[in-house]
Each structure stands twice: as structure tokens, then as C-alpha cells.
Amino acid sequence: MISAGDFRNGLTLEIDNAVYQVIEFQHVKPGKGAAFVRTKLRDIKNGGLTERTFRPQEKYPQAHIERSDMQYLYSDGELYNFMNVETFDQIALNDEAVGDSLKFVKENDMVKMLSHQGNVFAIEPPLFVELVIVDTEPGFKGDTAQGATKPAKVETGATVYVPLFVNQGDKISIDTRTGDYMKRV
């Protein structure tokens, strides 16, 4: 059992016979009255978002989530195909199950597949990936005072904002949680 005061992003809970994943949480301590926890929850069965408020002392059972290492094989336009690296079983998922979690993942990269009672509800890419920039405008010295960025398209087709000194053909590290440029590799 987990109390509402211990909620964290990514935590999965069973509430009212449904399984939810905490997307956002905020501890609120008003000047008058009792503290509470404001959350945004995602139903893992249908993907619907719900906002709900809890008292910090309320307790809920944590849902058992299976995490399996999978290799992203390819996309055929409609389905995304993965292979379990231990059993070599292949699984195909549609856009709804995958979402935008693969925008920084290349074919044959490793990901984590999250499922509850056999139903896949999310794909977790690695925290950091290294990708090559395939298209960006050249940056010129003296363009700006400080901290300017420009859009760059990486080999997976996603767009990332990078500093002006990064050029086409450079390999960069990207934080997949935020989509931010981290460093040039």
C-alpha cells in the first residue's frame, strides 16, 4: 500500500478497480485547511487522463507491472514490431500503445515494455540516446549574444533544438524524457 503523500511520477496504482499511472503530482499545503495531493492520472487500459485530489494519508495498492527488455525491430507503417531478447517472441503494437515514445529510437535499439496482466500500456526508451543530425541550418559566429538554438532533424525524423555550433553530420546525445539536446558526442 502506498500513501498519497508518497506518489511519484510513473507510479502505478489500483484505484476503484482500475489501474492508473501517475503522470503529474503536486503536494499542496494551503494556508487554511488540510494538505492534499493534486494528481493527473492516466488509465492504462484506455489511455484516458483524469485529474484527482487525494488526502496525503489515503493508501492505495500498487499495481504489479511487468517490465521486459525488448528490441525495437521495425515499423511497417501501421504496427511497431518488437522482439523479447530472452524468449525471442515477437510482439506488434499499434500507434495507440506506442504513442510518441519511439521518436528518438532507431531500429534494433533496446527499450523496456511495460505491461499489466499481459496488456502492454507503455514503451520506455533508454534515458539517453545518441543520434546523428541529418538536417540543420548552418550557425554563424556572432549570430547571438548567448544561448541561441536552432532546429535540427535527427536520423529518426524527430526535431531537436540544438546550439548554433552543432552541424549536420554531428552525433549528439538527447534526453528522451524531455527531448532536449544534452551534448555533442
UniProtKB/Swiss-Prot annotation:
InterPro entries: Elong-fact-P_C, NA-bd_OB-fold, Rib_uL2_dom2, Transl_elong_fac_P/YeiP, Transl_elong_KOW-like, Transl_elong_P/YeiP_cen, Transl_elong_P/YeiP_CS, Transl_elongation_fac_P
This protein's UniProt keywords: Cytoplasm, Elongation factor, Protein biosynthesis
Record's subcellular location: Cytoplasm
Manganese recorded as keyword: no
GO CC aspect terms: cytoplasm
SMART domains: EFP (SM01185), Elong-fact-P_C (SM00841)
Protein family according to the UniProt entry: Belongs to the elongation factor P family.
PANTHER family xref list: ELONGATION FACTOR P, ELONGATION FACTOR P (EF-P) FAMILY PROTEIN
Protein name: Elongation factor P
Native species: Lachnoclostridium phytofermentans (strain ATCC 700394 / DSM 18823 / ISDg)
